[in-house]
Amino acid sequence: MTSKKVIRLFGICVALLLFFVSAPQIHAQHAAAAATTTPISVYGAWACSNDACIWGTVRSVSEYDSQNHWLVDRGDGVPSVNLVVLSFVQPLKLLNKTNDAQTVNGVPIGMTQDIVNYFKSHNIRVMLSIGGITYASDWDQALATNPTQLGLNAAAVAQQMGVGIEIDYENSSSPNLTGLQAFIDAYRSQEPYDPTGANPAARLTIDLAAGDRWLIPLATKATTDWLTTSNPVLDYANAMVPSRQPSTSSAESNWQEHVDGKPQYSPPIPPLAPAKFTGSLYISDTKSGLPPECTTFTGSLINTTGSYVQSVAPNGAGTTSGMLGYMFWAAECPSSRGTCTTPPNSCTGGVGVGSSTYNIPVPMPPLRQS
């Protein structure tokens, strides 16, 4: 046998040895990766009615269903979502229990018990969102006036209607965090934190920016004091949509900022457990018609970010991998200028197919706590 043949044979033997040694390790790594994939729990939509989120008219259930049926039926009788957040309640009106042409006891007249029950009859959880960017100054005024009473009023509405409450306070520079703490304390005095999720009125959440570079004081306070896994005060946060629909990499980069925190900031923003927040995508309110996230699941961000959302690992907070899920902005007509999700349009092809693809549980199950 020539020396070249000996060398070649030796090389083959080494290659085979390396294959048999590394193959089990590779298999184990893939198995570990599969084991850390967590199913989506929260798959919800903000609902804006037909008047850019004012909810200023009373609507019959049949008329409302004719415009929004895709939410409760993705085509096979199963809802497209397991959460609907009726948006928005004006905080100052809620504090004052205002009654006017568009408001009753501080709540928009369109947010009726009939509409709430319409969703609940399909096992869809319902929440009311207080605030939004339009009402940021109203949040400021209400918190400066009587934040405790605002929290008590919010809890009373939640109890009466059987809904949860979402805090959407978008003061980016100088939020009244002392007032917001008093609001939360008052709410929790009536509705203590419920890890089981069985009590709808105990569900209290907050909206944060897409990443950690906007609403910085709010993110710092919320992540430090309200969204910890050791002493949770709020159930979870929604990482809101950015100014426009992101790319896959941009969306994941934004969400990763919450997971990593911002230790370089002063004060630092600590890491947020993946199990303590959702990521948000546009399904309407875009300039050029409805996006694929509404109409076409394949290739949409619901599709391309799915692996990340279900598997992102904790980085300093929490013990389980995967975010809670997705929120979608927004059903029906969030803007007077954009395209609505109403007939002949529908989001069954995007959100609905995503619901089926990810086997979204309806009703929403108890949420991971860490």
Describe every region a protein language model picked out.
Residues 302-312:
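Catalytic-core region of carbohydrate-active enzymes that cleave or remodel glycosidic bonds
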Residues 11-21:
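Bacterial N-terminal signal peptides
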Residues 24-32:
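Sec/Tat signal peptide C-region and signal peptidase I cleavage site
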Residues 366-370:
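Short, solvent-exposed mixed-charge patches
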Residues 326:
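Glycine-rich phosphate-binding active-site loops on the catalytic face of alpha/beta enzymes
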Residues 2-11:
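Bacterial N-terminal signal peptides that target proteins for export
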Residues 34-265, 271-304, 320-323, 332, ...:
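Chitinase-like catalytic core of GlcNAc-active glycosidases
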